[in-house]
Design a protein with these regions (language model features):
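Active-site-adjacent loop and "lid" segments of alpha/beta metabolic enzymes
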Residues: 4, 11-12, 16-75, 95-182
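Conserved phosphate-donor
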Residues: 78
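Short acidic capping loops at alpha-helix termini that bridge into adjacent secondary structure
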Residues: 82-85
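Active-site metal-binding loops of divalent metal-dependent hydrolases
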Residues: 92
Length: 182
């Protein structure tokens, strides 16, 4: 949510995380978040939800996202939010072209700075359709593949639609180093 009163009420009702697609930029959002003990997922988005996909442009998408993360971390700390509470989300599909999204994924490790967890939401995204031309419900296998790529490149948290398939794939991926070491 991006609405401070909803953040406060969500925390009161037992939410485990505050996730704001606007990166806690609305007036009062950081103050409301600071008043909770919850972790914050700060997401990058160019523009606003209703216009974000209208010709998104960057000189350098990695620098743009990294600068946004630095700026928001400074703002979080100024609001009294401990660094350890901050999770970053590069905002796949939020004000980015498919090319931007694939570039971010390929270089995701470069966003893993300062020990902050990176959360990614790649499941069923339109970037998959840019390659496979499939409807969202037909993007399960590609979504699982993207989740694996993201974790391999440093993502700590993956937000998915197909939990069992993704969990199984990550379990197999995680078992590989153990079997090699034996």
């Amino acid at each position: 949510t991006s609405t401070p009163s909803v953040m406060t009420e969500s925390a009161r009702l037992g939410a485990g995380l505050l996730n704001d697609v606007r990166g806690f930029r609305r007036p009062g959002a950081l103050q409301a978040a600071a008043a909770t003990a919850l972790p914050l997922c700060v997401m990058h988005m160019q523009g606003e939800p209703d216009t974000m996909q209208q010709n998104p442009q960057y000189d350098d998408v990695m620098s743009g996202v990294r600068h946004f993360f630095d700026d928001r971390l400074t703002a979080c700390e100024a609001a009294g939010i401990a660094r350890e509470r901050v999770i970053f989300d590069p905002g796949f599909g939020f004000g980015k072209t498919a090319e931007h999204n694939f570039h971010l994924l390929a270089h995701l490790r470069d966003l893993c700075l300062g020990g902050h967890p990176i959360l990614v939401g790649l499941s069923r995204k339109s970037m998959i359709a840019s390659v496979l031309d499939r409807a969202p419900e037909e993007r399960v296998f590609a979504s699982v593949a993207l989740a694996l790529m993201a974790v391999e490149r440093g993502a700590s948290i993956v937000r998915v639609h197909d939990v069992a398939a993704t969990a199984d794939a990550l379990a197999m991926w995680g078992a590989l180093p153990r079997s090699i070491d034996r």
